[in-house]
Design a protein with these regions (language model features):
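Non-catalytic helical/linker scaffolds that mediate oligomerization, partner binding
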Residues: 1-253
Length: 253
């Protein structure tokens, strides 16, 4: 998972996996078009009503400044926009924009811990490349090592799949991760161009209300089966078993 793997460590990770499972069973999962928090070196708790600055760099975040990556047009985010950090975590509201130094000024409207590498959802569409620079380097390295399985995160359209296909080719096995509303809207074309679909119910719930997730899941599965595309369901399955020996009755379904 390139969202949690340093490029410098990638050769070692691949080498170790190769010994355990063989090269044919290794899959590279891209970061994709998602904003994340940068490194946080110490425990930080941001209290409600605190004012904080938000930048678009991969620097160390503090209790005064939050840095987000990859780069995006930060000034395209208007005032009053809500920014969600992690799941059930910090919620910020943009109250001003510094156009000269290109940063946002936001107010904490829901307190929480600021942690490294947490997914960030902005309540307004911002443009992000479908593959990060890190993704491109990781994919090219993986191909040189003989890896032919890839998962593409935050696929939005068939065009995104065509972009990665130019790098991995059409013989590589591609899993397209459905975790946005755009992916659901473009599902027919995505299903035709990919080898498999993965429903990430966690990230999808940022854009689809939780009570509608089962309906979205059912639609994606039926659509994928109609196109004879294999489909995986992921995130929070058997969550109880992290701490308990058995799942709940609801989870067993």
């Amino acid at each position: 998972n390139m969202s949690h793997t340093n490029l410098k460590k990638l050769p070692t990770v691949i080498k170790n996996l190769k010994k355990c499972v063989g090269i044919s069973n290794i899959c590279i999962d891209t970061e994709g078009a998602q904003l994340r928090t940068s490194i946080v070196k110490k425990k930080i708790f941001l209290k409600k009503n605190k004012i904080i600055k938000i930048f678009k760099k991969n620097n160390i975040s503090t209790n005064e400044k939050i840095f987000l990556y990859p780069k995006f047009d930060i000034l395209s985010v208007p005032n009053k926009t809500k920014i969600f950090v992690g799941f059930d975590g910090i919620i910020l509201k943009v109250i001003n924009r510094n156009k000269k130094n290109k940063f946002l000024i936001a107010k904490i409207i829901q307190a929480g811990k600021l942690e490294s590498n947490k997914g960030v959802h902005i309540d307004k569409k911002v443009y992000l490349d479908c593959l990060t620079e890190k993704d491109n380097l990781a994919i090219k390295y993986a191909i040189r090592q003989g890896i032919r399985k890839f998962a593409m995160s935050f696929v939005n359209s068939g065009t995104d799949i065509e972009t990665i296909r130019k790098i991995i080719g059409y013989k590589s096995f591609l899993i397209s991760k459905v975790e946005t509303l755009n992916a659901i809207r473009n599902l027919k074309k995505i299903s035709r161009l990919t080898d498999a679909i993965l429903i990430d119910r966690g990230d999808l719930s940022r854009e689809v209300s939780i009570e509608k997730i089962p309906l979205a899941q059912e639609y994606i599965i039926k659509s994928s089966k109609k196109n004879k595309t294999p489909v995986y369901v992921a995130t929070n399955l058997l969550e109880t078993m992290i701490n308990d020996l058995s799942p709940t009755r609801a989870e067993s379904h």
